[in-house]
């Protein structure tokens, strides 16, 4: 140890030169001669301290000699490893991969220790070339959609950030070596895959948000665990993966062109807000008019005053948004307001409506009049806005009705001037409140001008009677006069309110009945215009992937995935809604990182790209692809095999068109016509198998229908009657005994007491088993009332289950699709997930009359 402390400056220079030769010349390596500092400190300390601190100095020397701090790459931030962190968990926190963290931090292994400083991708970093369609590392790695950025920000806010701070003593005395990072390595690594936040549009199972991962070898979609459909149905339904060599076509569309998939989606995402408002308005039916009037009346009485206001909103943005229209405001839409909306919809000006402010309380009549004057002044009638003039007339009638209330309040105040100051204040506040109620009723009233005049005359007569009564009792006791005045005023107000309410109900009912079709038509037109406007600024494009084999489920076992892949063998098209700015990234990725076709005989120079861009004039199969498909498609890349197939189909179609134009009959056309005729002649005979014994349950037509759905390995073999209740009796044990030695599918035919024919095809002979057995060839059928076949759905593998006392087909949810007891006498049929069937018989429980089992050998 003393030898280590006596290292001279010459040995330090030799060590530094050796390290410089080991590291590349383009990297700037700077060492601080820490050993000299340690030597000076040791000379100043006593020998005992040197001996006791030998282990600590050795550890410090190793740490200082190996300390490295890389220059932080662009788009990254510092993160300190915590006690329970691993490289995988850190990558999951920052929405990246462990391999990327290894590349960014130049790690030699995936092991991390608490307190270690790592560079992780910064979610708030915005690249200057992000808007470019070229494949930059940041644009490829980090999603650029607003939804993805919002999710990343929320995740980083929840996660505690710890800045690594070095000790001041070490920072002044030591200099760490700085290794400059090479951006070529990160670019070469990060450009090899795309990670896009998108939505998977399923066929009948909803739309799920998740991450689409595109690599040169695979395409995989992982759903978000926070999605409502994922929480309800589980990840097994939505996680899919496909090898890149199975992709035959990748196309980007403006809208979904698959008619079946488009019909299964309820409404476009951009039209949801508009349609919600329209559906809410359509709930106002003539049967609900009475409830509507009640709500209007209660709202008017609960509020102390009405403050008409003018709201200026844009038709294309806020008129039909859910945040602006509250349920109370929707219920207060009158026919005049609908007329205003319709008349102003043809012009470019904003819509101005008059509405009630129910939330304000205790506002006097002068404020209401001022607000009415403001609204009246702000509504300037134009040539096209004829509905606004009628609204101004309604305001004038409302003000005239309010003036009647003002005069009535004035006379009452003069007649009761002898009251005390306290009673006078109570009477004034009571009168002011009732004045506001009268004004509210008059403002809500939608009758004509004659009805308003009649209401004013009635109010004047009652006002005169009230004035006479108050003058006669003016010399009585002041408190008694106040109580009687309040009581009489209350009775008068209730009678007048009841009459006005009845008149208003009749008038409002007639007007809303007349204006309902017009209002619905207007709102539908506005919704369509809003939908068209938003369609221009749609933020999503639709990626259509066509594959040669169905995609595999990623969250199930390999056996289940293979079985489900076989069950969904007809599903060869998948749709994803991706952000529009990622369309160019996908296009460039498919062109650059496509799998190659290796031609061994021609060598390395004969390689062709795995995907080829399809041009407009190279589109074959015009009958299969509609004009709408070509119009909405932005771009499409196909595999080389698909490209050659389309070119051949296009050339064949052009040749046929030319022959048709020249009226030339080719040999293929003649052969196809002859083959069609022969097929029609021989079709009944080809589907009529040979039976070893005549069937007492199946007719000839029923046998032909069943033969069309049998597995291919049964075609051409004669039908052999293995078991029949007429010959062998009704015993399940006898059935199992007769099945021994068979190795073919078997057909079970049942006839119940209602003379209904149904049954099942089993992929294997019936036997006693501990669990379910069979394959996806198993299916159910029924002739009750019409012929129908129920194939395997792929949800589970509960095909056949044999016991000594029962025989069952299908399962899931505690119910069997078809069940027979040990005596083959009682049976039951129920819907199940295995086959997605309905009840095979007329009733759920049935009695077996006869059974036949046929084998194919």
Swiss-Prot record:
Cited function: May be involved in protection from oxidative damage.
InterPro entries: LysM_dom (IPR018392), LysM_dom_sf (IPR036779), TLDc_dom (IPR006571)
Start and end residues of each LysM domain: 77-120
Major site of localization recorded for this protein: mitochondrion
Organism: Xenopus laevis
Residues passing through the membrane, by range: none
Annotated region described as Disordered, given as residue ranges: 43-74, 131-183, 300-353, 372-409, 421-450, 673-694
Protein name: Oxidation resistance protein 1
GO cellular component: mitochondrion; nucleus
Domain TLDc: 696-857
Family membership noted in the UniProt record: Belongs to the OXR1 family.
Ranges of biased composition (kind: Low complexity): 131-146, 171-182
UniProt keyword terms in alphabetical order: Mitochondrion, Stress response
Residues annotated as domain GRAM: 190-249
Domain of life: Eukaryota
GO biological process: response to oxidative stress
Subcellular location: Mitochondrion
Entry-linked CDD domains: LysM
Pfam families in alphabetical order: LysM, TLD
Gene name as annotated: oxr1
Biased composition (Basic and acidic residues): 54-67, 149-164, 327-342
Ranges annotated as biased composition (Polar residues): 343-353, 381-393, 432-449
